Amino acid sequence: MDSIQIVGGKKLKGTIPISGAKNAALPLMIAALLTEETVTLDNIPHLADVELLIRILNNHGVGYAVDGQKSHHDCIDSRTIHFTAQKITTTYAPYELVRKMRASFWVIGPLLARCHEAYVSLPGGCAIGTRPVNFILEGLKTLGARIAIENGYVHAKAPKGLKGAHYHFPKVTVGGTHVMLMAAATANGTTLLENAACEPEVTNLIQALNAMGAKITGEGTSTLTIEGVKKLHGARISVIADRIEAGTYAMVVAMTGGNVLLKNANPHHLTQVLEVLQKTGLDIEIKPQGLHLKRNPRQTKIMPVNIKTGPYPAFPTDLQAQFMALMTRAQGTACITETIFENRFMHVQELTRLGAQIKLDGQTATVYGREHLQGAPVMATDLRASVSLVIAALAAKGESVINRVYHLDRGFERLEEKLARCGAIIQRITV
């Protein structure tokens, strides 16, 4: 099993290319099920979750072809993948595939829209709280679907097709918004979605669906109107840059100090995160090619900042663990409140193995900053927790080994390569 070995204490200098966003790529790939024509996606990252979804789509009869492009300057591949769902061969999504990644459940929307039936296993993915699919199922019911849960599977039917409806999400849900957009795109009539997610990844999907012939208005807001069309066609769409990856590397630079350009990072998708990081002492300059980050540890200490996670444009829950790692070396005390998922502090126990001082009280963590952390062997519990341990280890004295890094491979493309090119002492090892 692979592990990541890190010797901390090195400042970073260089350029880190930001990959395409996993959270945008997955729904765009699933949207290819909606048309028999070819959907071409540019800037697809090399990630375990992407490869798994390719297998799932292939299970439904989706053909694909990959164009690989390599930048000699960045030494990171970017890919274009052509997906063609000329004929859906099955509406059955088995447990052995869906259990590995929660987003794979989203195929229920396009399958129901195009084939009027779907038989999909209840999902898996990172073990963060319950993350119920109730909002998705209730939304599909409003579009006229009949839903039954049998032996761990959702059996959805709409023999006469889906019909436009009005649905108010009880709670903001990115996955639920993705599914309802795809299901309603070809429904008979107009659908109004209220309290919808307005994340950049949702906007990316709306733009893709509109490029395929859908009629969706309201992008970037919580109220979306979908005028159903009879048929969608092929299109070419580029996956947006990964704001979570960009935010993560920004926190790495804030933690270790250094001088780094985050190439292709979109500052408009990180407004609140960048405001918070500036308060911690990170110097941020927006340039045409991305974000230029600097911190001199001798001149600027890490300052504590309190945060509360929330739906976009608030501070993203997917950067909470990384920010907590940064605060472990702040000059004072910081409070971090998680409002999106319960049980998303599983990284705390492992951070304390590196010397962090953290107190938990319900959904709030109080972090008591320390001057130094100490390297140690640690265990990743989920995707974002794993990268928080990387951040802490990069600043810790001595050697750390992070185990179970398969979590890391689900969401970060070639992390050790990108960091090593900027001077970090980091390598993948097999133990």
Curated annotation (Swiss-Prot):
Residues that bind UDP-N-acetyl-alpha-D-glucosamine: 102, 318, 340
Catalytic activity: phosphoenolpyruvate + UDP-N-acetyl-alpha-D-glucosamine = UDP-N-acetyl-3-O-(1-carboxyvinyl)-alpha-D-glucosamine + phosphate
Chief subcellular location: cytoplasm
InterPro entries: Enolpyruvate_Tfrase_dom, Enolpyruvate_Tfrase_sf, MurA_subfamily, RNA3'P_cycl/enolpyr_Trfase_a/b, UDP_GlcNAc_COvinyl_MurA
Top-level taxon of origin: Bacteria
Active site residues of this protein: 126
Top-level enzyme category: transferase
Entry GO CC: cytoplasm
GO MF, one annotated term: UDP-N-acetylglucosamine 1-carboxyvinyltransferase activity
Record key words, sorted: Cell cycle, Cell division, Cell shape, Cell wall biogenesis/degradation, Cytoplasm, Peptidoglycan synthesis, Pyruvate, Transferase
Gene3D superfamilies hit by this protein: Enolpyruvate transferase domain
Cellular compartments annotated: Cytoplasm
UniProt xrefs under NCBIfam families: murA, PRK09369.1
Name listed for the protein in its UniProt record: UDP-N-acetylglucosamine 1-carboxyvinyltransferase
Organism: Bartonella quintana (strain Toulouse)
Gene this chain is encoded by: murA
